[in-house]
Amino acid sequence: MAFRLPVVAAPEMPVGTQTSGSGRLPKWLKRPIPQKNSNHLTAELMEELRLETVCENAKCPNRMECYSQQTATFMILGNVCTRPCGFCAVHRGRPPQLPEADEPDRVAEAAARLGLKHVVITSVTRDDLPDGGAEHFYQCVVAVRERTGATTEVLTPDFVHCKPALGRVIEAAPDVFNHNMETVPRLYRRVRGPKSDYRWTLEMMRQVKRYNPDVKTKSGLMLGLGEQRGELLDALADLREYDVDFLTLGQYLQPGEKYLPVVRYVAPEEFDELAVLAKDMGFKKVASGPFVRSSYHARDMAETST
């Protein structure tokens, strides 16, 4: 049975004290206009090695900060996703090609040239592949470790059509396994699409620990999609019941008109409060703030784990 914290605010109210997400951004979500990506070594290297980053494809608000620090989250298996998630800016459709056999070597080359100490590897969802791309994840993790000695983190799709594929990813022994819950059960299929499964998301975390107890597990949620406070705390309790180690909480930002609207903007102080509650639940490390994303400062989270 999941551990439940007492709800400290009226559960009928969504998380956040601000007005609805329509209209102008609150001041804490405003940032200076970034310079062109071509001025940054990381972006140039990605182009040279024909690599995709989730930073660009998902329009991450932190990408210029990460590029300036010569860090990036590699996105393997192409840039076309087979899932119609309502929040994600990655192009959706039928992927035009099979995985590129030399991509693991190119990822390792980029990691080596950037001098990365912690490498995050994610992907689009590939329901068109028999193993969902698990073998490609395995090859990328092994290539990075052999070439650089860096710690590795995978941020995977759910492999819902090939659940045994999860074991192949864990055979590569990444230091951190990340799969994002994204939202609360009531909103799950609206946000993540009709093929998503909240319970399987949790079960993945349990399976990872069964395959390799030394692998740290991590998950994250976006706030501002209409979740209620009690629902959010229950979802966090579910993650802890399934022994998830690390947690990220960030503000959902609508990437374009055709995507799910922002219901509310959550104030920074509330993110701080939620971080305290999550740590009290037993998460070993929590990153909580308006601009937090699943791989934001991932190295810091991995290195400070015990």
Predicted segments with their positions:
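Nucleotide phosphate-binding site architecture
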Residues: 61, 82, 185
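Auxiliary Fe-S-binding modules of radical SAM enzymes
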Residues: 1-73, 89, 105, 109, ...
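Short pre-active-site segment immediately N-terminal to redox-active cysteine/selenocysteine motifs
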Residues: 77-84
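Short, surface-exposed acidic/glycine-rich loop or hinge patches that mediate macromolecular interfaces
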Residues: 79, 157-160, 226, 291
